[in-house]
Amino acid sequence: MDQENERNISRLWRAFRTVKEMVKDRGYFITQEEVELPLEDFKAKYCDSMGRPQRKMMSFQANPTEESISKFPDMGSLWVEFCDEPSVGVKTMKTFVIHIQEKNFQTGIFVYQNNITPSAMKLVPSIPPATIETFNEAALVVNITHHELVPKHIRLSSDEKRELLKRYRLKESQLPRIQRADPVALYLGLKRGEVVKIIRKSETSGRYASYRICM
């Protein structure tokens, strides 16, 4: 196997690990063994006899943990798909959207290699209450939430949000904002109106929390 292919497989393996971590961090059941799948095992499982990755085989379903269901009753199951095609057109995206609809997934995560055509992107917001999210493989090679400068973000439930606003006598409009396009908001799958608790380290007080609403 040539070095270029080895590098590409290594990057894909790291992107796969980030997706597993992301799904786990959202409150879905993913084992630590799945997250820590060694590179050699990844190759054996997801590459053909010529050493070429078979992205379609990397797709998986995840279900919420019991703790997540108690906090987020509408969470539902999730489907992740890695696309074999370098460029994604309407036909491929339509097949993905129909799969999410027919199998009653609450969330569909579509991981693509190079680009998605504008026409295909128009299908993304087309199936409420289900949500379709798209991620570029290259953006997943490194898990941004593991960077030392990125503080811990925790999504609040509706009850926790209500309690927060009541405790501090705030209106939603008074909370600082986090944009839906923010990398951490995308990582957590935040929706408009949801609140995150952000825990930062402080030299004087150990740790302190702030809150932002997704807009």
From Swiss-Prot:
Q: What is this protein called in UniProt?
A: DNA-directed RNA polymerases I, II, and III subunit RPABC1
Task: Name the protein family.
Answer: Belongs to the archaeal Rpo5/eukaryotic RPB5 RNA polymerase subunit family.
Alphabetized UniProt keyword annotations = DNA-binding, DNA-directed RNA polymerase, Nucleus, Ribosome biogenesis, Transcription
Recorded hits in HAMAP family, A to Z, give:
RNApol_Rpo5_RPB5
InterPro entries for this protein: Arch_Rpo5/euc_Rpb5, RNA_pol_Rpb5_N, RNA_pol_Rpb5_N_sf, RNA_pol_subH/Rpb5_C, RNA_pol_subH/Rpb5_CS, RPB5-like_sf
Location within or outside the cell:
Nucleus
Q: What is the lineage of its organism?
A: Eukaryota, Fungi, Dikarya, Ascomycota, Saccharomycotina
Q: Quote the function comment for this protein.
A: DNA-dependent RNA polymerases catalyze the transcription of DNA into RNA using the four ribonucleoside triphosphates as substrates. Common component of RNA polymerases I, II and III which synthesize ribosomal RNA precursors, mRNA precursors and many functional non-coding RNAs, and small RNAs, such as 5S rRNA and tRNAs, respectively. Pol II is the central component of the basal RNA polymerase II transcription machinery. RNA polymerase complexes are composed of mobile elements that move relative to each other.
Pull one GO CC term from this UniProt entry.
RNA polymerase I complex
From the UniProt record, give one GO term of the biological process aspect. transcription by RNA polymerase II
